[in-house]
Amino acid sequence: MNEKMGRLTRRTLLGSAAAAVGSMTAAGRAAPAAMPLSRVRSEFLRFDDPADVFKQHFRMERDLVDREGSTLTWYHWTAFVIAEGRAPFPLMRYEGIEYSYFRVVAPLEYRIHAHNLSYVRDLTTGRFATTIENPITGRRVATRSTLLLNDPGTLASPRGFRNLAGDGKQYRQPYRLFRVEDNLVKLDSVRTAPPDWPVTHIENSCQWVDADLFENCTISSLPVHFAGSYVFPFLEWLEMGDAKGHMLGFFDGRKVNRPEDLPREFLERTERDHPELLEPRWGEFERPIKFLF
């Protein structure tokens, strides 16, 4: 920082702001200047080899390791109630993490397990909430943290995903499309749900990263940000009674290098309430698989 910039004070900043407003007012009376052309670059990325598509997807979503690795993502999301006969409305916020961990079990095939932890936050204040009012029933209910610890896991390869709760015969190829937007590479994708989950469940997301990082093949785990949505049933603790409908979540977040890098408030609560979820659950790999691969 040079000496002149170092002498900036609140008074000079306010004075500069006032002068800027005055200049904008004067400029508003003049003929508007023509905006320079700044056309958005938008292209689709195509890969001839399915193996290349899989590798790039794994770099974006997880980590293209040679043996085993893990990926930690952190997110905020807003939960909406979609009840029959009523306009959708936002009910609460969540803050949470997904920790996934994976091992190579065959050439370019990974066994993947994961767990999720999310805490309810007040929709207006953003503070952690122990109770919320359910507008459908008019009752105040106690909130529960959301823990997803029973995902059976998947096998992932260029051929598709095989859920470990199945017989291994069905490969499910996820929807995914890579595209370029200016200096970003984006991945639009739809995740497949375990076979025993509600048939209405679906999750889609968009992940993005700087193009120069994407093109650097030495980076096995790209530092992506992401946003997306998913549909899921009413949570049991909401006590919805006979109401028909479902929930809709909109989320956004990013990869985090390690648990110590999580936001302080979230990290401190998890260290107190669920410290075991701040590390991979490698014991999941000891569970036998029903089929050969």
Where are these predicted regions, by residue range?
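Short, solvent-exposed loop/hinge segments that bridge or flank secondary-structure elements
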Residues: R46, P50-P107, T130
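N-terminal secretory signal peptides and thylakoid transit peptides that target proteins
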Residues: N2-V21
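C-terminal segment of N-terminal export signals and the immediately downstream linker at the start
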Residues: A27-R59
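Short hydrophobic alpha-helical membrane-anchoring segments
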Residues: A19-R29
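Edge beta-strand at a domain terminus
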Residues: S229-F293
